[in-house]
Amino acid sequence: MFVKLLMLVIFFSVMIIVGIYSRKSVKDVNGFVLGGRSVGPWLTAFAYGTSYFSAVVFVGYAGQFGWKYGLSSTWIGIGNALIGSLLAWVLLGRRTRVMTHHLEAKTMPEFFGKRYQSSGLRLISSLIVFIFLIPYTASLYSWLSSLFGMAFNFDYKWCVIIMALLTAVYVILGGYMATAINDFIQGIIMLVGIVCVIIAVLNGQGGFMQAITKLSDIPVDAKNTASALLNMKGPFISFLGPDPKNLLGVIILTSLGTLGLPQMVQKFYAIKSEKAVKTGTIVSTLFAIVISCGCYFLGGFGRLFDSPLIYGANGAVKYDTIIPTMLATLPDVLIGIVVVLVLSASMSTLSSLVLTSSSTFTLDFLKA
């Protein structure tokens, strides 16, 4: 327990120190909301990636879709990297940076208002952004409660309070620049953490090949299998899984959304140059491949950890308990790494949501 708490304290301390350090870049509204439009490609790429992949992906989606589709759920990660990251940067990166710089727009609603010369459009879009980011933010707290309950026996409300306070402190102190630097640090933690967790889980199953063999012996689940594939052998290690059509739908749904999410598109507003966009495209795509593919690949082994703990009173699978169950037997050091990993994923997304929604509400609703 001491090791896990120590890692948390170090993590929290670093976040606050970064907020204090970044305060010097906050000289005006532009500096607070966009870091003075001088953020480098690596910081922007990591900020984009960490905003994309939160605790919802690691704890929720990885467990749910890994359970349904097995190792073929890794295709979701590939789709996220190629469509949600690479395509988004290619289509929007340079264009968004140029247009928002030219129009001096700091938020998505402000861009719409100036681009189409419509104050009504700006007002409506600001309300949409502010209102619909609230349930997304709430979902982050929900997924985190499962993991913190396993690791520390924390009460849900204390987890919410601690995260909210920490996010508020470093966002208020350093604005976008603090968020970007912390996102970079949190991204490094996520990269190291997901690799360590995958290795540990596979070793616990006797190695990669042994885990594959065990997974291949699990029979078809009629609830999550296309009717034409009910007789297939080894559905959870197959190339396209037991239900390719629905798998394709999940890939599209989880990948295309990034093209319109304000907290992610806003990263392009702040990048310092068009040249930096090219570097950011490569870095962001590679980051997405490791994190997203890693999460879904890990979730693909979820059925090896089938136990009464993952079922509700009505017999239905509680998908958000699958990943915590997989990790429950790990040593304290590794659980500490996992907690910091998920906390990093959540804090990075949460800070982006807070900054985006607050700046939109202030600049586009109250001020407008």
Question: Which residue stretches match the model-derived regions?
Answer:
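Membrane-interface helix-loop-helix modules in multi-pass membrane proteins
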Residues: 33-104, 245-257, 264-266, 270-308, ...
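Membrane-interface "cap" regions at the ends of multi-pass membrane proteins
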Residues: 1-60, 174
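Helix-loop-helix module between adjacent transmembrane segments
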Residues: 15, 76-171, 250-257, 344-352
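Membrane-water interface regions at transmembrane-helix termini and the short interhelical loops
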Residues: 67-69, 92-95, 146-150, 165-186, ...
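Membrane-interfacial loop-to-helix junctions in multi-pass transporters
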Residues: 39-42, 116-123, 152-161, 240-244, ...
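Alpha-helical transmembrane segments of multipass membrane proteins
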Residues: 7, 11-18, 84-88, 170, ...
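Small-residue-rich segments of transmembrane alpha-helices in multi-pass membrane proteins
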Residues: 39-48, 113-118, 186-200, 286-288
